[in-house]
Amino acid sequence: MKFFIDTANLAQIKEAQALGVLDGVTTNPSLMAKEGITGKNNILKHYVDICNIVEGDVSAEVNAMDYDGMIREGEELAELHDQIVVKLPMTKEGIMACKYFSDRGIRTNVTLIFSAGQALLAAKAGATYCSPFIGRLDDISTDGLNLIQEIRDIYDNYGFETQILAASVRHTMHVVNCAKIGADVMTGPLSSILGLLKHPLTDIGIAQFIADFEKGNR
C-alpha cells in the first residue's frame, strides 16, 4: 500500500519524506488556507514546491464547481509539473471533467466519495484515484472501512485500474485495516504515519537493551 500525506505543510512533508516511505501528497483548498497560502500565484507556486520535495504524485484540487472552470483550472494545474494529479469533486460536472482529462492522458483523483456507487462512476470515467472518506463516515456512525471493502470488490470484479485512495484517515488502525482490506493508497496526517512506529513493548524492549548495555559497560 502506498503512503500519502494529507497536508500542505512543507515541514511535515519533508519530515515524512525523510522516513523514506512517502509515496505522494494530497492537498485541498482547506489545507492550503490552513497554511496561509492564498492567491492563485502563491497556490500554484506552493504546488511546485511540494513536487520538488517528493518524488510521487501530488493531488491538486480545482476550486471551480462548473465544468468549464474545472477544465480550465485542471489543465493549468496539469501543466505545472508532471507529478500533479488533478483533484475533482464527486459531482456531475466533476465526473464529466474526469472523463475529459482521462481521455487526454491527464491523471485525476475524484474526491469526496461516500458510496460504492460514486466510486463506480469515478472508475467508469477513468479516474486514476478515487478518494473515499472513511473517517467522516465513521463520524456519522457508518462503517467507513466497509465502504473500502465494497469498492475493492467492485473494482476487482471488473478489473478497473482506478486506485482506491483511502482518505480522511484518522489513526494508525485506519491505516492497518485499509492495508488488510486492500486499499491501494492511504492518505492521512503525519501522525498516522509516525504512529505506526510506536508500540509500548518496543519502548520497553529498547529501554531494557539500553539498561543492559550501560550495566555491562560500567
UniProtKB/Swiss-Prot annotation:
User: Which GO terms of the cellular component aspect does the record hold?
Assistant: cytoplasm
Q: Which Gene3D superfamilies match?
A: Aldolase class I
Cite the active-site annotation: 87 (schiff-base intermediate with substrate)
Q: Which GO terms describe its molecular function?
A: aldehyde-lyase activity; transaldolase activity
Identify the keywords attached in UniProt to this record, alphabetized: Cytoplasm, Pentose shunt, Schiff base, Transferase
* Predominant place of localization: cytoplasm
Q: Which enzyme class, named as a word? A: transferase
Q: Which reaction does it catalyse?
A: D-sedoheptulose 7-phosphate + D-glyceraldehyde 3-phosphate = D-erythrose 4-phosphate + beta-D-fructose 6-phosphate
Provide a GO biological process annotation.
pentose-phosphate shunt
Enzyme Commission designation = 2.2.1.2
Q: Which Pfam families match?
A: TAL_FSA
Highest taxon of the source? Answer: Bacteria
What pathway does the annotation place this protein in? Carbohydrate degradation; pentose phosphate pathway; D-glyceraldehyde 3-phosphate and beta-D-fructose 6-phosphate from D-ribose 5-phosphate and D-xylulose 5-phosphate (non-oxidative stage): step 2/3
InterPro entries tied to this protein = Aldolase_TIM, TAL/FSA, Transaldolase_3B, Transaldolase_3B/F6P_aldolase, Transaldolase_AS, TSA/FSA_arc/bac
Subcellular location as annotated:
Cytoplasm
Q: Which family does it belong to?
A: Belongs to the transaldolase family. Type 3B subfamily.
Q: What biological function has been recorded for the protein in this entry? A: Transaldolase is important for the balance of metabolites in the pentose-phosphate pathway.
Q: What is this protein called?
A: Probable transaldolase
Origin organism of this chain? Flavobacterium psychrophilum (strain ATCC 49511 / DSM 21280 / CIP 103535 / JIP02/86)
